[in-house]
C-alpha cells in the first residue's frame, strides 16, 4: 500500500489534512479529509490541481489535473477531470470530514497525483452543470482559500 498526504493551509482560516491510500497500481484510491475553518453548513469545491507550486499561494497550482483532456464533472461522471473530487460539506461547526473512493485518482503510474496540489475552493462546485463555459473548466467554485502539495506519507 502507498499512502499520500496533503496538509491544507491558506490565508482565510481554512486548514486541514487530506489522505490518499492505494493498494496497488490498478486499485481504487481511498481519499479521506478533515478540513476546518469554513462557514457553517456550506459546500466547497475540492480538486487536485496540476502543479505542486504554491509560491503565489493557491493560485500558482494551475488548473484541475486533467491528463485525459476531458471537461469538468462530478466524481461519478465518466467525462471528468482526474482531479475532480466534487464538494466537501461543512457541518454546523464549519468542519468537513469525509471519505470517498475514486478509480481515476492514482498514486502510482503516469497519472500520479504526487507532487500536485489539493485545493479547496470558497464556493460550491456545480459539477460541470452550470450551463456556461467556466462550469466545464472549474465548476464555478471560485477562489482558493486553502491548498496543500501532495507528498508520500508514512
Curated annotation (Swiss-Prot):
<dbReference type="GO" id="GO:0005758">
    <property type="term" value="C:mitochondrial intermembrane space"/>
</dbReference>
<dbReference type="Pfam" id="PF00080">
    <property type="entry name" value="Sod_Cu"/>
</dbReference>
<feature type="binding site">
    <location>
        <position position="121"/>
    </location>
    <ligand>
        <name>Cu cation</name>
    </ligand>
</feature>
<dbReference type="InterPro" id="IPR024134">
    <property type="entry name" value="SOD_Cu/Zn_/chaperone"/>
</dbReference>
<comment type="function">
    <text>Destroys radicals which are normally produced within the cells and which are toxic to biological systems.</text>
</comment>
<dbReference type="GO" id="GO:0045454">
    <property type="term" value="P:cell redox homeostasis"/>
</dbReference>
<feature type="binding site">
    <location>
        <position position="84"/>
    </location>
    <ligand>
        <name>Zn(2+)</name>
    </ligand>
</feature>
<dbReference type="GO" id="GO:0019430">
    <property type="term" value="P:removal of superoxide radicals"/>
</dbReference>
<dbReference type="InterPro" id="IPR018152">
    <property type="entry name" value="SOD_Cu/Zn_BS"/>
</dbReference>
<dbReference type="GO" id="GO:0006825">
    <property type="term" value="P:copper ion transport"/>
</dbReference>
<feature type="disulfide bond">
    <location>
        <begin position="58"/>
        <end position="147"/>
    </location>
</feature>
<dbReference type="GO" id="GO:0050821">
    <property type="term" value="P:protein stabilization"/>
</dbReference>
<dbReference type="GO" id="GO:0005507">
    <property type="term" value="F:copper ion binding"/>
</dbReference>
<feature type="binding site">
    <location>
        <position position="81"/>
    </location>
    <ligand>
        <name>Zn(2+)</name>
    </ligand>
</feature>
<dbReference type="GO" id="GO:1902693">
    <property type="term" value="C:superoxide dismutase complex"/>
</dbReference>
<protein>
    <recommendedName>
        <fullName>Superoxide dismutase [Cu-Zn]</fullName>
        <ecNumber>1.15.1.1</ecNumber>
    </recommendedName>
</protein>
<feature type="binding site">
    <location>
        <position position="72"/>
    </location>
    <ligand>
        <name>Zn(2+)</name>
    </ligand>
</feature>
<keyword id="KW-1015">Disulfide bond</keyword>
<comment type="similarity">
    <text>Belongs to the Cu-Zn superoxide dismutase family.</text>
</comment>
<keyword id="KW-0479">Metal-binding</keyword>
<feature type="binding site">
    <location>
        <position position="64"/>
    </location>
    <ligand>
        <name>Zn(2+)</name>
    </ligand>
</feature>
<dbReference type="InterPro" id="IPR036423">
    <property type="entry name" value="SOD-like_Cu/Zn_dom_sf"/>
</dbReference>
<feature type="binding site">
    <location>
        <position position="144"/>
    </location>
    <ligand>
        <name>substrate</name>
    </ligand>
</feature>
<dbReference type="GO" id="GO:0031505">
    <property type="term" value="P:fungal-type cell wall organization"/>
</dbReference>
<dbReference type="GO" id="GO:0004784">
    <property type="term" value="F:superoxide dismutase activity"/>
</dbReference>
<dbReference type="GO" id="GO:0016670">
    <property type="term" value="F:oxidoreductase activity, acting on a sulfur group of donors, oxygen as acceptor"/>
</dbReference>
<dbReference type="GO" id="GO:0045944">
    <property type="term" value="P:positive regulation of transcription by RNA polymerase II"/>
</dbReference>
<dbReference type="GO" id="GO:0005829">
    <property type="term" value="C:cytosol"/>
</dbReference>
<keyword id="KW-0049">Antioxidant</keyword>
<keyword id="KW-0963">Cytoplasm</keyword>
<dbReference type="GO" id="GO:0005634">
    <property type="term" value="C:nucleus"/>
</dbReference>
<dbReference type="InterPro" id="IPR001424">
    <property type="entry name" value="SOD_Cu_Zn_dom"/>
</dbReference>
<comment type="subunit">
    <text>Homodimer.</text>
</comment>
<dbReference type="GO" id="GO:1901856">
    <property type="term" value="P:negative regulation of cellular respiration"/>
</dbReference>
<keyword id="KW-0862">Zinc</keyword>
<keyword id="KW-0560">Oxidoreductase</keyword>
<feature type="binding site">
    <location>
        <position position="49"/>
    </location>
    <ligand>
        <name>Cu cation</name>
    </ligand>
</feature>
<feature type="binding site">
    <location>
        <position position="64"/>
    </location>
    <ligand>
        <name>Cu cation</name>
    </ligand>
</feature>
<feature type="binding site">
    <location>
        <position position="47"/>
    </location>
    <ligand>
        <name>Cu cation</name>
    </ligand>
</feature>
<dbReference type="GO" id="GO:0006882">
    <property type="term" value="P:intracellular zinc ion homeostasis"/>
</dbReference>
<keyword id="KW-0186">Copper</keyword>
<dbReference type="GO" id="GO:0006878">
    <property type="term" value="P:intracellular copper ion homeostasis"/>
</dbReference>
Amino acid at each position: 500500500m502507498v499512502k499520500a498526504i496533503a496538509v491544507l493551509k491558506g490565508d482565510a482560516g481554512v486548514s486541514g489534512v487530506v489522505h490518499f491510500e492505494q493498494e496497488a497500481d490498478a486499485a481504487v484510491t481511498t481519499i479521506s479529509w478533515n478540513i476546518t475553518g469554513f462557514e457553517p453548513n456550506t459546500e466547497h469545491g475540492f480538486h487536485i490541481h496540476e502543479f505542486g507550486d504554491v509560491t503565489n499561494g493557491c493560485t500558482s497550482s494551475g488548473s484541475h489535473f486533467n491528463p485525459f483532456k476531458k471537461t469538468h464533472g462530478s466524481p461519478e461522471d465518466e467525462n471528468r477531470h482526474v482531479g475532480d473530487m466534487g464538494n466537501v460539506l461543512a457541518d454546523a461547526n464549519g468542519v468537513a470530514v469525509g471519505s470517498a473512493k475514486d478509480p481515476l485518482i492514482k498514486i502510482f503510474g503516469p497519472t500520479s497525483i504526487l507532487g500536485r496540489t489539493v485545493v479547496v475552493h470558497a464556493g460550491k462546485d456545480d459539477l460541470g452543470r452550470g450551463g456556461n463555459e467556466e462550469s466545464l473548466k472549474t465548476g464555478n467554485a471560485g477562489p482558493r482559500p486553502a491548498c496543500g502539495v501532495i507528498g508520500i506519507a508514512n
